[in-house]
Amino acid sequence: MAITPEKEKALAAAMAQIDRKFGKGSIMKMGEVGGRLAIEAIPTGSIALDIALGIGGVPRGRVIEIFGPESSGKTTLAQHIIAEAQKMGGVGAFIDAEHAFDPVYAARCGVNISDLLVSQPDTGEQALEICEMLVRSNAVDVIVIDSVAALVPRAEIEGDMGDSMPGMQARLMSQALRKLSGAISKSRAVVIFINQLRMKIGVMFGSPETTTGGQALKFYASVRLDIRRIETLKQGQEAIGSRVRVKVIKNKVAPPFRQAEFDILANEGISREGNIIDIGTELGIIRKSGAWFYLGEDRLGQGRENVREFLKNNPALTDEIERLIKAQALTNPSAIAPSADIGDDDGVFEE
């Protein structure tokens, strides 16, 4: 049923009054938004994870949480997202609350260190205020806070060792996210919170794992990624990296509960070529016969490691295979990104 002329006139007057009071664009019809309906994304550096996320990466203008055990690849993944944003002409910032940033490893992950903004704040309040100022500048594309557990309230730092201050960090995070959420959406910045796991005492049923910082981040995050190391990669007796599995625990922009697996190598971060071989083989773009890999009728090499080195030395061919994978996989992500089994063993409960 069409809107009557009287209602249309009253609605137009109300919208005009809202625009005058709160600024142009405060309210609008979705049909007039046009091209802005599509969700923009920044790639993660792993094509498997881009597919699992459903939109080709992490969404702009949203809060992202990456959590997992120690040495599982949380910071590596965040640094690859910064590197991808820089390749697109964007600006990245790294708020190092843990005071453990390694510029050499970040460069190996593809981050342009000379253009990266780095801050090592003294308190949690300072870290979140710096984040807010960067967001409101509308000039930064990716902001990484490493980590939520290291955002220590000022009162705790100034107090004595052993002082009990329950809930203070949770209140800090809740207040900060209330202030930040609207500004993040308007700025189109991706704000990534890296979080750690803790164990809950006395849990008899379900997972005893919990993330730090209270409940607020769980609600404000549009995407929550659970990253775990599932295998140690070795060359002979020497460990050269890890194979990790990422589960999309929450996703507001595409179907959740998908998962992705990829290699993280000590000397380069996420192995782009290894990821392309795995996904290309699953989709049938790369054909495997015995130990040999083929692209069409062209032989790529014998053994996965040899093919990985071949693709690394032939970036144009790698780009072409990646283009074919994205064209095929992003139209049907569920065909390549299986759903994760989210049960008691995998669920993470927040404090």
Swiss-Prot record:
Gene Ontology BP terms: DNA recombination; DNA repair; SOS response
* Single GO term (MF): single-stranded DNA binding
Q: Which SUPFAM superfamilies match?
A: P-loop containing nucleoside triphosphate hydrolases (SSF52540), RecA protein, C-terminal domain (SSF54752)
Which residues are noted in the entry as ATP-binding? G68, P69, E70, S71, S72, G73, K74, T75
Annotated InterPro entries: AAA+_ATPase, DNA_recomb/repair_RecA, DNA_recomb/repair_RecA_CS, P-loop_NTPase, RecA-like_C, RecA-like_N, RecA_ATP-bd, RecA_C_sf
Q: Where in the cell is it found?
A: Cytoplasm
The cysteines joined by S-S bonds are none
Gene3D superfamilies referenced in this protein's UniProt entry, alphabetically? P-loop containing nucleotide triphosphate hydrolases
- The keyword DNA-binding is assigned to this record: yes
A GO CC annotation recorded here is: cytosol
In terms of one coarse class, where is the protein primarily found?
Answer: cytoplasm
Pfam families, alphabetically?
RecA, RecA_C
Keywords noted in UniProt: ATP-binding, Cytoplasm, DNA damage, DNA recombination, DNA repair, DNA-binding, Nucleotide-binding, SOS response
HAMAP family cross-referenced by the UniProt entry:
RecA
- Give the protein family: Belongs to the RecA family.
The role this protein plays is: Can catalyze the hydrolysis of ATP in the presence of single-stranded DNA, the ATP-dependent uptake of single-stranded DNA by duplex DNA, and the ATP-dependent hybridization of homologous single-stranded DNAs. It interacts with LexA causing its activation and leading to its autocatalytic cleavage.
Designated name of the protein: Protein RecA
